[in-house]
């Protein structure tokens, strides 16, 4: 086994990653495979925080007649459903896990308290952050960047459907070029599809590297933590 490159990581998963080929809902086989990969990190002594999107359950569209704020709050509830599903998969493997939500849901999760989250991580517990930032108009990418800064994570592991960052959509263009490394400024200036601009700026301001990789094989989570060059790293350069 290689040497761990990071001590504390923030894993950002899209809600669609949990849906698998169904495109909607939760594929519990996929949730379990992700949980197994996270367990490997915990067994290696790595402290893991996680943020899951909600797009497999709800994709709010203010343009379809719904109030944007209401749609965003519904999305926060969707992320909390995903957080509980991932917690269940992890705990079935014996991984001590806590869900903390930015909106109080005391019957099912702890409220987000930074000091408590840090203490859980130090004790080897996985902490899953639900309900985004608790505020409308902010994405779960921004929530991941914010929580990563607050818990002093060494890196954000950004699991996507593609194996890195490209200059254009590799599913549409055969000549799409993959980047091995990028600076935050390059991502922002070129409008590259990594995180949204708010999240990218937050990572830049706090010098948090973003490691983009494909989740088609959950083993990739361990591989990137061990330093394998299988994705794109976004940093100050």
Swiss-Prot record:
Q: Does the keyword Kinase apply?
A: yes
What main location does UniProt list?
cytoplasm
Where is ATP bound in this sequence? Answer: 12-15, 55, 59, 166, 169
Q: Which GO terms describe its cellular component?
A: cytoplasm
Q: Which SUPFAM superfamilies match?
A: Carbamate kinase-like
Entry EC no(s): 2.7.4.22
Which keywords are on file for this protein? Answer: Allosteric enzyme, ATP-binding, Cytoplasm, Kinase, Nucleotide-binding, Pyrimidine biosynthesis, Transferase
Task: Name any one GO molecular function.
Answer: UMP kinase activity
Q: Per its UniProt record, what Pfam families does this chain match?
A: AA_kinase (PF00696)
Could you tell me which pathway this protein works in? Pyrimidine metabolism; CTP biosynthesis via de novo pathway; UDP from UMP (UMPK route): step 1/1
* Cellular compartments annotated: Cytoplasm
State the Gene Ontology BP annotations: 'de novo' CTP biosynthetic process; UDP biosynthetic process
Region (Involved in allosteric activation by GTP) residue ranges read 20-25
**Its family?**
Belongs to the UMP kinase family.
Role noted for this protein: Catalyzes the reversible phosphorylation of UMP to UDP.
Q: How does it assemble?
A: Homohexamer.
Protein's recorded name = Uridylate kinase
Q: Which gene encodes it?
A: pyrH
């Amino acid at each position: 086994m290689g040497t761990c490159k990071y001590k504390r990581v923030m894993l950002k998963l899209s809600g669609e990653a949990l849906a698998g080929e169904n495109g909607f809902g939760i594929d519990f086989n996929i949730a379990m495979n992700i949980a197994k990969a996270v367990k490997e990190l915990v067994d290696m002594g790595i402290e893991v925080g996680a943020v899951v999107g909600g797009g497999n359950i709800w994709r709010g569209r203010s343009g379809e007649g719904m109030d944007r704020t209401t749609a965003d709050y519904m999305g926060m509830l969707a992320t909390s459903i995903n957080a509980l599903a991932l917690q269940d998969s992890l705990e079935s493997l014996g991984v001590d896990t806590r869900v903390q939500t930015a909106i109080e849901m005391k019957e099912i999760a702890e409220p987000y308290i930074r000091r408590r989250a840090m203490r859980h991580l130090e004790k080897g517990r996985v902490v899953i952050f639900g309900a985004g930032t608790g505020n409308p108009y902010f994405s779960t990418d921004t929530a991941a960047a914010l929580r990563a800064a607050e818990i002093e994570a060494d890196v954000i592991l950004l699991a996507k459907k593609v194996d890195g960052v490209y200059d254009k959509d590799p599913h549409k263009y055969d000549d799409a070029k993959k980047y091995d490394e990028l600076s935050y400024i390059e991502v922002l200036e070129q409008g590259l599809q990594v995180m949204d601009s708010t999240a990218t700026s937050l990572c830049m301001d706090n010098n948090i590297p973003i490691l983009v990789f494909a989740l088609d094989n959950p083993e990739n989570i361990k591989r990137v933590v061990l330093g394998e060059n299988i994705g794109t790293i976004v940093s100050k350069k």
